UniProtKB/Swiss-Prot annotation:
Amino-acid positions noted as binding FAD in the UniProt annotation, renumbered to this chain: E36, Q44, Y49, V91, F124, T327
Protein name: Ferredoxin--NADP reductase
E.C. number: 1.18.1.2
Disulphide bonds in the chain: none
Top-level taxon in the UniProt lineage: Bacteria
A molecular-function term among this protein's GO annotations: NADP binding
Keywords: FAD, Flavoprotein, NADP, Oxidoreductase
UniProt subunit comment: Homodimer.
Cofactor(s) the record lists: FAD
Family membership: Belongs to the ferredoxin--NADP reductase type 2 family.
Length: 332
């Protein structure tokens, strides 16, 4: 594939912050190209926790990952005539010549006047449970993310983990599953205090500190999980219909070193205008790093218009690019 069209702004990453940035760029009259390495848009909320309840999005007392992405896509559809989407493409390098970036991907190349990086911390993969025969049961009834709470109705569910996702899934499944057991290798959980309070008020069987030892099952179907109490000989075999491993996800921004921008670990250093060290390239959301950074979707949503407006000013330095309110830009 060779893309000859020159876009105003290319957004690397199709998660919630990238989708919002694309909408805002469309609102400002820009042509936009979204390049996403995965097979669908939405990033982690869509793929890892579509049914997980989210409470910290402004004006939404409660939503889910799936609902959030669905609404962002509906919003973006308004500008479908000026927004292109390329899925399953990994951005490898980009280089500017005569004011135009040539973006090389795993499928070909794209041309753009400016780039906004919104790829979070890069590609992600689940951290394993760490027992010998784990792969025998993976993605059967041993799961690393939850797509539907209904799939656990009436089942004996064991969850391994101690962070926000593990505690949240335990709380959400309480009352849906026949039983829920949460095991964690430490006494204290790393989740939000309120979520932990709800956990101990629920009927979830909390087992701490325990570590997984062995999965038993037949024909790829896990039937029990054996756990051992830390610093003890006590061993417990837990019957399971479903095992959810919630040890978090490892991320990989391996191509970052080829993008010619300053970065620390897996995040790109930006200034107050979300400019990177390379002129015409901006970074927002989980991809951006600056003093006082808070890694929340809501924060990334606020960063996006700033970066887009800076990109427009870069593209059209002599243009009338002063930001205006959306009510002045959209006529129903």
């Amino acid at each position: 594939m060779a893309e000859e069209k020159i876009y105003d702004i290319t957004i690397i990453g199709g998660g919630p912050v990238g989708l919002w940035a694309a909408f805002y760029a469309g609102l400002r009259g820009m042509t936009v190209n979204i390049i996403e390495s995965l097979s669908e848009l939405g990033g982690q909320p869509a793929i890892l926790y579509p049914e997980k309840k989210i409470y910290d999005i402004p004006a939404f007392p409660q939503t889910t990952g799936a609902e959030l992405i669905e609404n962002l896509l509906i919003q973006l559809k308004r500008f479908e005539d000026r927004v292109s989407i390329h899925l399953k493409e990994e951005v490898q390098t980009f280089k500017k010549t005569d004011g135009i970036f040539t973006i090389a991907t795993s499928k070909g190349q794209h041309l753009s006047k400016a780039i906004v990086i919104a790829c979070g911390n890069g590609a992600f993969a689940p951290r394993p449970l760490g027992v010998d025969n784990e792969e025998d049961f993976a993605n059967n009834n041993l799961l690393y993310n939850v797509h539907s709470l209904d799939q656990f109705a009436g089942k004996k569910v064991v969850i391994a983990g101690g962070g926000d996702s593990a505690v949240d899934w335990a709380n959400h499944l309480d009352g849906v599953a026949e039983s829920v057991t949460l095991i964690h290798r430490r006494d204290a959980f790393r989740a939000h205090e309120h979520s932990v309070e709800l956990l101990y008020q629920s009927s979830v069987n909390v087992m701490t500190p325990y570590v997984p030892l062995e999965i038993k099952g037949e024909n790829g179907h896990a039937q029990s999980l054996t756990v051992q109490r830390v610093k003890s000989d006590e061993v417990v075999e837990l019957p399971i219909d479903a095992l959810i491993v919630s040890f978090g996800f490892s991320t990989n921004n391996k191509n970052l070193r080829n993008w010619n921008v300053d970065y620390k670990r897996s995040s790109i250093t930006v200034n107050a205008q979300f400019e990177t060290s390379q002129e015409g390239v901006y970074a927002i959301g989980g991809a951006a790093e600056y003093d006082g950074k808070i890694d929340l979707i809501a924060v990334g949503m606020g960063e996006a218009p700033i970066a887009i407006n800076q990109a427009i000013q870069y593209i059209e330095p002599d243009g009338k690019n002063r930001p205006v309110h959306s009510t002045s830009l959209i006529e129903e």
